[in-house]
Amino acid sequence: MKFIGIIPARYASTRFPGKPLALLGGKPVIQHVYEKVAAVLEAAYVATDDERIYDVVKSFGGQVVMTRTDHKSGTDRIEEAIEKIGGEWDVVVNVQGDEPFVAKSQLDTICHCFDDPTTQIATLGKLFESMEAVQNPNSPKIVVDNMGFAMYFSRSVIPYVRGKEMSSWLTHYPFLKHLGIYAYRKDVLRQVTQLPQSSLEIAESLEQLRWLQNGFKIKVGTTDVETVGIDTPQDLERAEEFLKAQLL
């Protein structure tokens, strides 16, 4: 199977404008992401709607494609990008442009999800380590079936452990945190971008619920590697400390 990584990157961000170009350890954040993805997959491209990002990616020797400015999601952007890139790709891996520490093991895990021929879409989950984190609505929870396919994603705490103090729930059930890396069979990517928003997606503000609600199967690979995304300038400061710790 042939895997291509596409990294959607926008300059406009409410909380941190220009974050793909922010310097981390002397290199733009987008360069960190690109180099991690390019080292594992057969090909990697940045998909952007901003000439500043386009120029920076070109300057460090990366592959980049310009996309429209009116996309409502990164999924729509990568679908346009793969159509422009062309080629005979089996699976498209979507890594966010603000994930400079995406690990080789995570990319390997999500690719291996497609060893199962019934996998249409894949994503990653990691076990929660505290109930405080489980209760954070910004950390979506996943429940999976016995075959490793997602049954539901929610910002609410699911499942509810009846008859136990919430402080002890982690000892009774392995709560799984969703990490926002996706991969799609190429034909499935085209199909999901044609779907209208669904009621569950609107309720939870989770795009992947649109796919589940329309009957697509999402395989969940598990990882023990935490992601360190950058959404704010404060996140960038923490990322600098994380990078320094890695280099020690």
Enumerate the predicted regions with their spans.
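Conserved core of the sugar-phosphate nucleotidyltransferase
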Residues: K104-L195
